[in-house]
A protein has these predicted regions:
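DNA polymerase sliding clamps and clamp-related checkpoint/processivity subunits
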Residues: 1-211, 217-347
């Protein structure tokens, strides 16, 4: 049988997805967003064109590793907001070489502009393997300064420990002559939110990869026979795949009170729901209505989830639209996240 082809994210969709889709991360202990002035290392050279400082090297490392799982080369935009409540730091919006997966991400940092800083967008493109391997020399308590020397195309970053005057590792990365290759997606709305335990979803994806399946089918079903007014609405979220020698199905049940449904609001399906739905197993197909069903590449899904650490994951689904999966970064800023947008497989 001929292998399914992977659809690219269309130009129409590239004009759709807005940043307001991100949901607040869970409350976390307050930690510094970037080094205090007394902790920063002094540069011995003239002021750089721009500089970004981070107080937690572990966050920057996690950020880069998750982006690097998908992108071999990445363009980072340096963003500085004049609004104290606005976003300043590193922003990513790039599509992979196969033009199948879009990565949107941002990480807060303190941005300083030098007198020679260029007007308009500022950024750099580097090979991700060089960046992530260099960041491994830092520990969780270390700070990171990242800057572009005046008049240079290189990017330099230094990893150091606060209040310690000993030698700090410094790396100079050659940048690639490549700009931002994506216009992004704006205004895309989703009708289905599926909340599922990260280890549960990652286990199904890993099993599909181990069995050499190319695609994973994500589906949402609802019983054709509805309960009496006021009774819970039952949904079934099913992960399945068909490999050459193994086929598998992972069904999950969810119960949502009918009164909770509001027109214009997405339906939230909690695959981790342990409340009784009245069903011992997934009913036969003839007793179910298909709410959503689409297929996505196992390889991309595996790279998405392998570096994640949060306990729960939210999948945004809608027929004919790409899968949207968002990973809040934590830290002191709730605006920091990595978002993966994956086009479905063509049948």
């Amino acid at each position: 049988m001929e292998a399914p082809q992977q659809s690219a994210i269309s130009e129409e969709l590239e004009e759709l997805l807005a940043h307001d889709l991100s949901e607040p991360a869970a409350a976390l202990p307050e930690v510094p967003r970037y080094p205090a002035p007394k902790h920063r290392k002094r540069d011995s050279t003239e002021p750089p064109d721009w500089k970004v400082s981070f107080a937690q090297s572990v966050l920057l490392r996690t950020f880069c590793e998750n982006v690097g799982n998908i992108l071999t080369e990445c363009y980072f935009e340096v963003v500085r907001s004049e609004d104290p409540d606005g976003f300043s730091g590193l922003s990513v919006e790039s599509i992979d070489q196969g033009r199948v997966c879009l990565v949107q991400a941002r990480l807060s940092g303190q941005v300083t502009l030098g007198p020679g800083a260029p007007a308009g967008p500022r950024g750099f493109c580097v090979r991700m393997s060089n960046l992530t391997s260099s960041l491994k020399s830092g520990h969780a308590c270390h700070f990171v300064d990242l800057w572009q020397p005046a008049g240079s195309s290189d990017v330099v970053f230094r990893i150091y420990e606060p209040n310690v005057s000993n030698y700090a590792p410094e790396f100079t990365l050659r940048t690639l002559a490549k700009g931002n290759d994506c216009q992004g997606l704006n205004g895309l709305e989703y009708n289905l939110f599926v909340e599922i335990d990260l280890e549960t979803f990652r286990g199904a994806v890993r099993m599909a990869k181990d069995h050499k399946a190319d695609v994973l089918t994500l589906a949402v079903y609802a019983p054709k026979k509805k309960g009496p007014p006021g009774s819970p609405d039952v949904s079934f979220f099913v992960i399945s795949y068909d490999a050459d020698e193994v086929s598998s199905k992972f069904p999950y049940q969810s119960s949502t009170e009918s009164e909770a449904h509001v027109d214009g609001k997405p339906t939230v399906i909690r695959a981790n729901d342990t409340s009784s739905t009245g069903y011992d197993c997934l009913p036969p197909e003839e007793e179910l209505d298909t709410v959503f069903s689409d297929r996505f590449g196992v390889e991309h899904l595996f790279h998405f989830v392998r570096g994640m650490e949060r306990r729960e994951l939210t999948l945004r689904l809608d027929q004919g639209k790409p899968l949207l999966l968002e990973y809040p970064m934590g830290g002191s800023s709730r605006a920091d996240y990595i978002r993966f947008v994956l086009a479905p497989k063509i049948q």
